[in-house]
UniProtKB/Swiss-Prot annotation:
Cofactor: how bound: Binds 1 [4Fe-4S] cluster per heterodimer. The cluster is bound at the heterodimer interface by residues from both subunits.
MF terms in GO: 4 iron, 4 sulfur cluster binding; ATP binding; metal ion binding; oxidoreductase activity, acting on iron-sulfur proteins as donors; oxidoreductase activity, acting on the CH-CH group of donors, iron-sulfur protein as acceptor
Residues annotated as binding substrate: 428-429
Active site: 292
UniProt pathway annotation: Porphyrin-containing compound metabolism; bacteriochlorophyll biosynthesis (light-independent)
Cofactor(s) needed for function: [4Fe-4S] cluster
Its EC number(s): 1.3.7.7
Superkingdom of the source species: Bacteria
Organism: Chlorobaculum parvum (strain DSM 263 / NCIMB 8327)
Designated name of the protein: Light-independent protochlorophyllide reductase subunit B
């Protein structure tokens, strides 16, 4: 039944495809029923690349099951002839995992060289998207990484960048720019854009950079254990984190450089990291102290998403923009302990760990923060609640797969995040001002024609004025149903409350009315509630 609702994580099949679709010369064959070919539509809809997804389905039909036959060997053979990939990854879907078939034996029956086939028989009932992707990438690194002489010049590997990653290409560009400024070359980016030969030469780099807690850290750990390669796992989200990231890279590279007798790398001038090469690399340090951004000081923010983004964005909002964090959470339970450790001292209460968007939405409705940083799910929830929201984590929609340069990593990314915070919350304030003061003559609405209303006749035969009738009708309705009702005048007064706290004010007023025994909230009751609640 969960599939009838939004899910934060996709299936294991989705995680496998994110890795293989990122690579060159790698094709995936899914042993699955026809319906599981939805995965190709996901990439053609969201991924802004000219290539078609490198995925094929070995269709399992009910007739095949009855006969005890399998199409898998024939499908693998067809893929090998048509696409000629260097590697074919065979994986089961949730449906075919129930059959408990030996995929390795069936794949070998295709007659294709075993060295060109990799069976990744992950259990899709126990493993979801993130864990499946991390597991497959680690297995690929274990299989193909080979001892290599180190590159002559300082170099790094960038691990964990995958298809459908959050602002993938922009983040890569930002990291490449900073590394180039340091004079450090990129040996391999994997899995994004990597082929089998690239995986083989991973050990040639001096340092591994794995900024994503969800993907790449296990592979970096394997390379460290087996090839002695140091790794840097912090994500450069924000100015402070980027400076730490740069210093960590310089320190690790200089250790290896000293063994080779090379001159140490020095931290360049900060302006060298800027887009124009003349100004500060980020405007956040001074912008955060302007009158505009000072108004954000102590504004309440809630952050939800994957582990990497939640930790980085939470620290950025509090440490660099001065916002008040009222809560944070993640949909990845296996990363929860790491997130708690990283955010110790940042949260007023417990970390929210859930994969149910309804629980996150309920928290937002209860707290009504001034800003929510979340996923596409939170964007939908916040639209219903009239709460400003910016997307900072997968899952995302087309709005976060842009052709332009919008990184979240590095100095450039700090500027993008600050802009998103500012515009998300400020545009919300603009909406409130328009609600409060009107459209200032920008639009002219036609006046509604006057409608003559006959005086209402009460039960005892007396005439009631038209102004009194609605209030009496509201009382009658409320008495009959036992529910609270609001008069038109009270609703009008509520409309002058800023939209981002309006629901909370309505709820508090309802509670006050129940306490004093009122069933109809009039303008007078609304004013009393406001005084009682300290507003």
């Amino acid at each position: 039944m969960r599939l009838a609702f939004w899910l934060y994580e996709g299936t294991a099949l989705h995680g496998v495809s994110r890795v293989t679709n990122s690579m060159k010369g790698v094709h995936t064959v899914y042993h699955a029923p026809q319906g599981d070919d939805y995965i190709t539509a996901t990439y053609t809809m969201l991924e802004r690349t000219p290539e078609f997804p490198k995925l094929s389905i070995s269709v399992v039909r009910g007739q095949d099951l009855a006969r005890g036959t399998s199409r898998l060997p024939g499908t693998v053979e067809q893929v090998a002839k048509h696409y000629n990939p260097e590697l074919i990854v065979v994986a089961p879907s949730c449906s075919t995992a129930l059959l408990q078939e030996d995929l390795g034996q069936m794949a070998r029956a295709s007659g294709i060289d075993e060295n060109k086939i990799m069976v990744y028989a992950v259990n899709p009932f126990r493993v979801a998207e993130t864990e499946a992707a991390e597991g497959l990438f680690t297995e690929l690194v274990k299989r193909f990484a080979a001892e290599q002489p180190k590159t002559e010049k300082p170099s790094v590997n960038l691990l964990g960048f995958t298809s459908l990653g959050f602002h993938l290409r922009s983040n890569l560009t930002s990291l490449r720019r900073m590394l180039k400024t340091l004079g450090i070359e990129v040996n391999v980016v994997a899995p994004w854009g990597a082929g089998i030969d690239d995986l083989k030469k991973l050990p040639a780099a001096w340092v591994n950079i794995a900024p994503f807690r969800e993907l790449g850290c296990q592979a970096a750990g394997y390379l460290k254990e087996n090839f002695g390669m140091p790794s840097i796992t912090e994500a450069p989200l924000g100015v402070n984190a980027t400076l730490r990231w740069l210093r960590a890279i310089i320190a690790e590279v200089n250790k290896i450089g000293a063994e080779k007798g090379m001159a140490p790398i020095e931290m360049p001038e900060m302006r060298d990291f800027s887009l124009d090469g003349q100004s500060a690399p980020s405007g956040v340090p001074w912008f955060a102290r302007t009158a505009d951004m000072e108004s954000f000081s102590n504004k309440r923010a809630f952050v939800f998403g994957d582990a990497t983004q939640v930790v980085g964005v939470t620290k950025f909002l509090k440490d660099e923009l001065g916002m008040k964090i009222i809560g944070a959470g993640t949909y990845l339970p296996k990363q929860a302990d790491w997130v708690r450790e990283q955010l110790e001292g940042y949260l007023p209460g417990e970390l929210m760990v859930t994969d149910k968007f309804q629980e996150v939405s309920a928290f937002i409705e209860e707290e009504m923060p001034e800003l929510v940083c979340g996923t596409q799910m939170e964007r939908h929830s916040c639209r219903k609640l009239d709460v400003p929201c910016m997307v900072i984590s997968t899952p995302t929609h087309i709005e976060n797969h842009l052709l332009g340069y919008y990184p979240f990593f590095g100095f450039d990314g700090a500027d993008v995040m600050a802009d998103r915070v500012y515009t998300s919350a400020k545009l919300g304030l603009e909406k409130h001002l328009i609600d409060f003061f009107g459209d200032a003559g920008l639009e002219y609405e036609e006046e509604e024609p006057e409608v003559f209303t006959e005086p209402a006749m009460s039960g005892n035969g007396t005439v009631t004025s038209s102004a009194e009738a609605p209030a009496e009708a509201a009382v009658a309705t409320a008495t009959a149903t036992g529910e609270l009702s609001w008069t038109a005048e009270a609703e009008k007064m509520l409309g002058k409350v800023p939209f981002f706290v309006r629901k909370k004010v309505r709820k508090n007023t309802d509670n006050y009315a129940r306490e004093i025994g009122e069933q109809v909230i009039t303008a007078d009751v609304f004013r009393k509630a406001k005084e009682h609640l300290g507003g």
